[in-house]
Amino acid sequence: MTLPLQGNRIREIATELTDAEPVMIINTHYHLDHTHGNPAFAPGTRVLSTERTLSHLQALDTDFWTGDAAQLLPNETFSDRRRIVVGSKTIDLMHVGRGHTDGDLVVLLPDENAVHMGDLHFNRHYPNIDLEAGGSVRDWPMTLERVLEFEFEIVSPGHGATTDRDGIRQFQSFMAQLSQIGSDAAAQGTSLADTLQTDRLTADEGYEPISFVVSLGLDRPFVLQRAWEEATGNFERLN
């Protein structure tokens, strides 16, 4: 839900499908493409997220969440897990570790044998790695391993086409390889410039940068830089 306009369309579709107004919003993390549609919904709508997501919205996205929009900030938060029932459907919301940010949640839909991953899964796209909001290249593979302990077959990623458990495993392999490159660079004192030239990142075959109207800069050099920055603790940028 990047913009209220898109939130309006989602609200319309949900109403058409159910003959009722939506009663709940789930924000998987704080980034604008997953939260800025909230104000399109009615004040008083349940808005669920992790505690960390609410903290990030209040600290890192303050300009947007003013006036009427503030009424659609998350109003039900939790630290690790929350089970909710909507009609006959059970939905499990779970924070299982750091990855994209430190507040990501996954949405398990047992009746549909499905999981929505939020941005813990970019299917065949280079991911945004928000170290500033507690994201972690190093922890991401283990977080995905915890997700794979649950029972599901259908996987809805935060970005990219619907996939399956093998799609998560492929992305997990990519993140593990990226983490190892960063760790080795830190141990060997490899510069950022040299790290960006590595030919060791091979699990990204077929990956594409995400773009909307303009490029977001989420590409191979970006993820290598983020891995190097986390591993070395050096956040100086190349010009």
Regions found by a protein language model. Name each.
Residues E76, D80-R82, G87:
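Non-catalytic beta-strand/loop surface segments
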Residues L48-N75:
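Acidic/polar short surface loop at catalytic or gating sites that assists cofactor/ion binding
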Residues V23, N75, E153:
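Conserved acidic residues
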Residues P4-L48:
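Active-site metal-binding motif and surrounding structural segment of the metallo-beta-lactamase
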